[in-house]
Amino acid sequence: MNKLHFGASYYPEHWKEERWAEDIRLMREVNFTVVRMGEFAWSTLEPAEGKFNFDWLDRAIEKLAAAGIVSVLGTPTAAPPAWLIEKYPDLLAVNENGRRVQFGNRCHYCVNSPDFHAATHRIVSAMAEHFGANPAIIGWQIDNEFNRVCYCERCQKFFQQFLASKYSSLAALNEWLSTSYWSQTYSSWEQIPIPIGAHNPGLMLEFKHFVTASYRQFQKLQVDLLRPHLAPDVWITHNFMGWYGGYDHYEMAADLDLASWDWYVPTGHHDYLKSGATHDLTRGFKRKNFWLIETQPGNVNWVPINNSTNKGEARAMAWHAIAHGADAILYWQWRSALGGQEQYHGTLVDQSGKPRPFYEEAQMLGKQMQLVSDLLAGSRMQARVAMLNSYDSRWSIEFQRHHGDFDYVAHFNHYYRALATNNVGVDIISADEPLDDYQLVIVPALVILNEKRVTNLTNFVQRGGHLVLTIRTGMKDEYNALLPSRQPGALAELAGVEVEDYYVLDELVPLEGNLLSGTSKQWAERLKVLDSNMTIPMARYSKSNGWLDGQVAMAVHSFGRGMVYTVGAYLDDPAQQKLINHILQIAGIRVLETPEGVEISQRVDPNDRVIYFVINHTAEARVLTLPWSGFDHLTGRDVRELQLEPYGAAIVTRSDQETA
């Protein structure tokens, strides 16, 4: 079973080799168990075409291993070197304005370039053959933070081929993408452009699918080169960027062994009610624990105000990530580079080679992680609540927000926060996943319906599940065309309501009900009850624009053995909290009350013992009385009352659950 790992990104190629021993000594003192290396080292690993220089990395891996530190290697394809660009200049990506990007940054490649694929094949094959059997390497990272979209003529041609392989004919494409609108009908595949700006919504959605397919193909090229050379327990990952929306992460994660992500707080301080959702999202990519493979040791360097985290805050952030399923915490980076674009980014060791003040905080965290590594081995979250995430629905909204401030992720987090405030564990999973393990499922803005989604949701409620449908759900088909029926489309019978009309709001609209009163912002749907015997209005709009006055804003419908809540309003925070509190109670989901800013999350070990993470996310001390006696594994003490220092944490098991 996996143990906890603690470490950082390390770039030995930046420093003279005689310095490495001191770096490794400091790493051991800070209780590192792992480093990530190599992901930007292409020009050092292959200084000229086909001329490989792996000796330096061999020595670094060996020296680290001798100190008990294992390695994760990154394939260096995010940083194609100058000699490669000079030989193959059209390897550079083209931006949406038709200009080639400039060498000197990263991820500057066209993901569909055959020359780039050939160069990738060469460097990754050589690394796999050379390093693949090294027992000191426990995992591999493919590339780094996939993000570039290319608009070159080659990508346009491949996009046309992608469409031709998906649609049986141009006639089918024209029909499904509604190209008769504005005389967009295509008579040859070669006429189809890469959509830019306010283009055909169906074609825009297909281009997102094409970008996903392109990156997945490029990633799989590397996975397939690596895997034959790796032991079964050596994993392959890619470092995702949380809620980044450039591609479908479920598709991208399918070929990987492990999901990982890079967590940064640009300005201000972390909000655990928000960041928890991103951890849960990443855990959902593979439905298992993940690695936090990059996070900040202090500040970032790429926003207008790059403030540092408070003393102790990064430690609370680390326990927060682990509580939500992270099995590793790696800081970016170990030491400040003397040059390059990230000179001012936070590190553990400064440009002089001396530890920064943050080093002591990391040292404490590393020691604590060692204390509980065995305790947490094999443990995972077990949630009874799921939230369904849909990239195609998100893209559909982003193409046509209708209200400029309407944001899919913000709306998603609006529901998540109300759950997290109650310390309720949540799985964030694909909208196409089965729902057998849950008591409550929340479906935020599932614009796009398909047969699988309708079937899964219907079966879930039929079996006794509680379902929440929010605004904008069930508007479109999988081609991003409006359904020829009212919202929520094929879910209308399940919901017991249909949307007579929807209204974009330029001001708050009041609503009232027996359960709650409040306001709706940005968006309001006028619900029509289809079966008054089985459907109860929960709230109605008060006087507003005339169209909404007295109309149903929320309703609950009994279906099979379950219940469906349709929320046609974008509720204010207090009303939202009341609604979720009520639904949790009805659904039989246990909540845990804590002082403001204190989180309780749970992991369950292979023996079904619950491990409680109690984390103070504030700069002030907090006191919490547990409803049972327990043992704090960080202090080694029996506890009933927890006195948490600012950003302090406790990892507690119940005394009545202790095993021999």
Question: Which residues does each PLM region occupy?
Answer:
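Aromatic-lined substrate-binding rim segments of carbohydrate-active enzymes
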Residues: 22-28, 36-100, 222-230
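Polysaccharide-binding and catalytic clefts of secreted carbohydrate-active enzymes
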Residues: 97-258, 262-275
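The substrate-binding groove and active-site-proximal loops of carbohydrate-active enzymes
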Residues: 6-15, 40-55, 102-121, 143-150, ...
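Carbohydrate-binding surfaces of carbohydrate-active enzymes
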Residues: 189-192, 232, 242, 253, ...
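Conserved, mostly hydrophobic/aromatic
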Residues: 8, 27, 35, 64, ...
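Short, well-ordered coil/turn segments that N-cap beta-strands
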Residues: 2-4, 31-33, 65-71, 133-138, ...
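Aromatic- and glycine-enriched glycan-recognition loops and surfaces
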Residues: 14-29, 48-65, 118, 122, ...
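Short, acidic/polar
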Residues: 15-29, 120-126, 241-252, 310-318
